[in-house]
């Protein structure tokens, strides 16, 4: 499959001819099994026709920066799924939590979550989400969104209580901002939905620029 890249969106992109001239509504596939992303998409009037998680290796490359990782993995997810669904709009996203240049893992063990939260305690960190969209015409639209999040200093009681909740399981950086961890957040600069897993403003721009109707 041959792709053409579109990285910058302008006003003219919003007037994509498919938006007005499409005879049938193409399928929309979310290349992610994340229930959070499905819920976020519903806020802008989108219910995926199908959810197809991409089976890829998410291991960071040597010296890969957080921003680069989010962009690479989101595009790889979209391309992987689009290969078997060439007539659909395929949307993928990847969220990366970083302390400085250190990429924090998805917490699969309580020890992972404890280590991540220890690093986040009392300081600011960054959350990057790469989003990638491949259209039925094999066009590629990509964005990377950054949000700064500042935690309060966590005491032993905070940490023990949160770890016992199990909310951290499978979460990048070991926390979910939309859950109990909201009580740890002193400040946020940028997109809140980006930290949840899908930046809605930028995703809307991406979809509209590609000719996919939202808010329906």
Language-model-detected regions and their locations in the chain:
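N-terminal amphipathic/hydrophobic targeting modules at extreme N-termini
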Residues: 3-15
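Short terminal hydrophobic/aromatic SLiMs and anchors at protein ends
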Residues: 3-4, 20-22
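Anionic-ligand binding patches
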Residues: 18, 24-29, 64-216
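N-terminal beta1-alpha1 ligand-phosphate binding loop
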Residues: 24-46
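Cofactor-binding loop segments of dinucleotide-utilizing enzymes, especially the Rossmann-like FAD-
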Residues: 33, 54, 136
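Short loop/helix-cap segments at secondary-structure boundaries that form the rim of catalytic
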Residues: 40-43, 61, 83-84
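Phosphate-coordinating loops and pocket residues in cytosolic domains that bind phosphorylated ligands
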Residues: 43, 53, 197
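Short glycine-rich, Thr/Ser-proximal phosphate-binding strand/loop in the N-terminal lobe
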Residues: 48-63, 140-146
